């Protein structure tokens, strides 16, 4: 699961869509409460990969002639990340309800296919992007991308998929929106992971030594794989568009529907 998380969290192909298939193929001997928490908490490893890879762009302090200086451009970037996170805070109370009612084959397949089609439509517009650098992103852009990010509350949507589609429609270049999407993950995924751990602890549940080891290994694997996935996507979008991911999502959605039909008939 750490490998799947590390790859699918950053590519716009829906980690949930892959997880729901993986859970069908591989039967995990763990409680539903632990698995629910595990799926979210291993994202911490993925987030750490972003911090490590982009540390120079994310740390707002530097040294000049032996003195600590502040970097206004980095602070501006963080303020825009915060602006994009605000819409998520508004809808976050619905997260558990959405997972309980819509974490199923049909919803996941529908979102996979829908956003697959959206990627193809958006890329076929032949529109010329006017936002090529992160410092050209306005607070309005950031807030609207945050609204798109809210759609990821629906299982199968893909957080990166929603924000990339939104960013492309707003006129961001592929490389710019991909990088901004990585940064948005830091507060959103870290907050979601910590909230899941807190809820798990308050429920009175306790992890066994084996479960703790599995969680740690999952985070480490997610970190290592994420390093490669992020590098791959940043290099890929410099030379290609997102049509491949659109087709991939549609095919995966059809596979999920087929698995749902087979499961229902079994």
Give each language-model segment a name.
Residues 1-266:
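Multi-pass membrane proteins that catalyze or facilitate reactions on polyprenyl-/lipid-phosphate substrates
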